[in-house]
């Protein structure tokens, strides 16, 4: 099928691609999507099936399980994890800035100072609210 543009140029639809040169990327993407699916299907087909009650037990490093698997734990773990994630993400954002510091100039330095100041205020707030104290 042949189309004609407003400029009079004829384009053959069978050879027209939106992103020419990305064939290798598309192939890689398809393979990357197929490998985990293939691994899961292969596992499902080849894995031994055991109907014993031992299979349903919670694994505790080779020891006999004691009690149930559903236990309560202190909610403060979430607060520590949240504070850790916040400051971990901070380092992820600051690392590229530090690598390119000499090329970015004064404006980027001021922006980084504002970013660090906001995070320090958040840390002070969490500290003041007792989020970092274990009792």
From Swiss-Prot:
Gene Ontology MF, one: NADH dehydrogenase (ubiquinone) activity
One Pfam family named in its UniProt record: Oxidored_q4
InterPro entries: NAD(P)H_OxRDtase_bac/plastid, NADH_UbQ/plastoQ_OxRdtase_su3, NDAH_ubi_oxred_su3_sf
Intracellular or extracellular location(s): Cellular thylakoid membrane
Enzyme category, top tier: translocase
Reaction equation(s) it catalyzes: a plastoquinone + NADH + (n+1) H(+)(in) = a plastoquinol + NAD(+) + n H(+)(out); a plastoquinone + NADPH + (n+1) H(+)(in) = a plastoquinol + NADP(+) + n H(+)(out)
Domain of life: Bacteria
Membrane topology field: Multi-pass membrane protein
Principal cellular location given in the protein's record: membrane
Family under the similarity heading: Belongs to the complex I subunit 3 family.
Name listed for the protein in its UniProt record: NAD(P)H-quinone oxidoreductase subunit 3
Gene designation per UniProt: ndhC
